[in-house]
């Protein structure tokens, strides 16, 4: 039987190697060709970790090479070490939270007379141009009341009946002042229909209108005799922009197993 030739290694242009070897199997000489490519992998580790890997082993592992010995060491998943915050950081966080609570408490001490929302003064109300200053003083000493009273004729004789709108301090409901206010309210009020009977004002505010923190008024229409909801509610928003956004988001949306129908409120004729 002929001798088995020595293995040959051929360097290829692409950096790989072709290894040709021979062996005898069942009286036959077999030629085995293998093509391998060496890939160098560089692992970057922390400097301190690299130093610890050089430490000399002791005990039963004395004299063993670097790295874990699978016969004596069991490898498990890598665990990330999370250090608890220091006492100083905890105290700083508590201090910030207390300061924030203090500021919120100070904001609630004053309420805007224009929109009724706490946190800012009447003179700095962001809804001043929309809501107007119906309760604030107007130009002149007597303000708006004095201007209206001046235009109202007084009773010509004592004992004569004077309508409430023409009495001192009264305002005519058909005047431009009330008309403008109604128009502003209608422009910021939506009519929500097909509401679940169990949805009250608090539920609508907290669950349906949660994206709108400033909702001045929510009124559910109820049966006068039974007090049950008729599935209709009127919602007045802080601005016309908020009302338009709510109309776009809520119309056709499912709420408490019913599909809502939302539209602008219609003034009573």
Swiss-Prot record:
Region: Disordered, residue numbers: 155-183
Compartments, as annotated in UniProt: Cytoplasm
GO molecular function annotations of the record: RNA binding; translation initiation factor activity; zinc ion binding
Biased composition, class Basic and acidic residues, residue ranges: 169-183
Domain of life, per lineage: Eukaryota
Biological processes, Gene Ontology terms: formation of cytoplasmic translation initiation complex; translation reinitiation; translational termination
Entries under SUPFAM superfamilies matching the protein: Retrovirus zinc finger-like domains (SSF57756), RNA-binding domain, RBD (SSF54928)
Domain RRM: 188-267
CDD domains reported in the protein's UniProt record: eIF3G, RRM_eIF3G_like
Keyword check for Chaperone: no
One term under GO cellular component: multi-eIF complex
Keyword line: Cytoplasm, Initiation factor, Phosphoprotein, Protein biosynthesis, RNA-binding
PTM annotation (Phosphoserine): residues: 64, 135, 156, 165
Main localisation: cytoplasm
UniProt family annotation: Belongs to the eIF-3 subunit G family.
Subunit structure: Component of the eukaryotic translation initiation factor 3 (eIF-3) complex.
Protein name: Eukaryotic translation initiation factor 3 subunit G
The organism of origin for this protein: Eremothecium gossypii (strain ATCC 10895 / CBS 109.51 / FGSC 9923 / NRRL Y-1056)
Name of the gene encoding the protein in the UniProt record: TIF35
């Amino acid at each position: 039987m002929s001798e088995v030739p020595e293995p040959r290694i051929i360097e290829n242009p692409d950096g790989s190697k072709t290894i040709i070897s021979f062996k005898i199997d069942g009286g036959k000489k077999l030629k085995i060709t293998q093509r391998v490519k060496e890939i160098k992998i560089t692992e970057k580790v922390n400097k301190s970790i690299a130093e610890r890997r050089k430490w000399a082993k002791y005990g039963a592992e004395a004299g063993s090479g670097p790295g874990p010995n699978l016969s004596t060491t069991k490898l498990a998943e890598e665990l990330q070490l999370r250090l608890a915050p220091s006492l100083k950081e905890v105290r700083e966080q508590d201090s910030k939270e207390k300061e924030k609570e203090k500021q919120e408490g100070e904001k609630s001490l004053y309420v805007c007379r224009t929109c009724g929302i706490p946190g800012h003064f009447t003179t700095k109300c962001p809804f001043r141009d929309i809501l107007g200053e119906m309760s604030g003083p107007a130009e002149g000493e007597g303000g708006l009341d004095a201007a209206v009273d001046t235009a109202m004729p007084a009773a010509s004789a004592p004992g004569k009946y004077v309508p409430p709108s023409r009495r001192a301090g009264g305002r005519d409901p058909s005047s431009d002042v009330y008309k403008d206010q109604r128009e502003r309210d209608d422009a910021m009020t939506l009519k929500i229909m097909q509401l679940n009977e169990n949805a009250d004002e608090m539920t609508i505010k907290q669950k349906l209108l949660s994206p709108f923190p400033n909702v001045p008024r929510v009124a559910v229409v109820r049966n006068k005799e039974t007090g049950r909801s008729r599935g209709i509610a009127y919602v007045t928003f802080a601005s016309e922009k908020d009302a338009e956004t709510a109309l776009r988001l809520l119309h056709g949306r499912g709420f408490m197993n019913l599909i809502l129908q939302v539209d602008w409120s219609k003034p009573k004729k």
